[in-house]
Amino acid sequence: MMRNAQYKMGDGSILNYYEIGTAKDKLLLLHAQGTNSLSFNHVIAKLSKCYHVYLVDYYGHGGSSNNPEKYNLISIGNDMIHFIENVICDSVTVLGHSSGGLIAAYVAAYSDKCTKLILEDPPFFSSWGERRYNTYNYKDLSTACHNFLSQSKEKDFVHYYFVNQYCWNFFPEESRERIREKLGGFALKYREKHPNKNLKVLFWPKKFLEGFNGLQHYDPRFGEAFYNDSFNDGVNYCELLSRIKCKTLFMKAKTTIGENGLLQGALSDEDLQRVKSLIETMEIERFDCGHGIHVERPKQFVQAVVSM
């Protein structure tokens, strides 16, 4: 049975976390931006048979503190190291999905408690500096967060993001606004009736609603940190990655380069090879699916983790 608890940092910040399993080996899971630890529900039961699993909501997500001063890699990374040292109190395999992978890499670079590292499709180099402008995340979630914070009419970010997400650009132009208005109305009604539940929208594919799970507890100011690049906080990723000496697995999802060179995915194959050249101990496993590998390919995902 999964236990939910909170850990209070010395500065009063709260890290909400879940714990399950009694195995000797410890596993720390760090979720993607916009969701929370429960996004791993597809795989947690099987992982907990092999690991004592900890799942932490990092700041701006889930039940953890909303503190914009901590929405950067260094602050979150250092607090995750503190969590490992004071809650897990043991060596640990650290797995991070997407932006959680950036945090996991920081932990592996600066803590000898991290003995194995699993990177689930993190956006190394692509979300850094001017490169970020031509990525799907920047056009989508980051820009939606920035625009939401720049207005005062719309109060509910979940509904705002649904009707302003970048994927509407892939709908036929002649029917786009009609469909957006109709489905946006469904989304608004659901949000008004169920403000604390994961979003459900009639006719919207369940696969794509996964990205909205936990969004009702997301602080859009975290997305602003990716919009203005303050999340990276001047971190030199070449230096950071070269510090990682533990056994490392990189899970690579499919990447598509769209019109005008838009990176529709976390990172390019060139970025991946750059990461590989910096982490000497890294192996790569490719998955024929989108960015959420643990959601789209749960059996293959679990097998890869357990094989570590």
Regions found by a protein language model. Name each.
Residues S242-D288:
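Conserved loop-alpha-helix segment in the C-terminal half of the alpha/beta-hydrolase fold
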Residues I118-S175:
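Flexible "cap/lid" loop of the alpha/beta hydrolase fold
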Residues R286-P298:
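Catalytic histidine-centered segment of alpha/beta-hydrolase-like enzymes
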Residues V295-S307:
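Post-His helix in hydrolase/transferase enzymes
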Residues E174-E239, T255:
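Hydrophobic, aromatic-rich cap/lid helix
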Residues Y58-L95, S99, Y106, E130-R131, ...:
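Active-site loop/oxyanion-hole signature of alpha/beta-hydrolase fold enzymes
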Residues S13, E19-G63:
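Conserved HGGG/HGGXW glycine-rich cap/lid loop of the alpha/beta-hydrolase fold
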Residues G101-D112, L117:
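Short glycine-enriched nucleophile-adjacent loop
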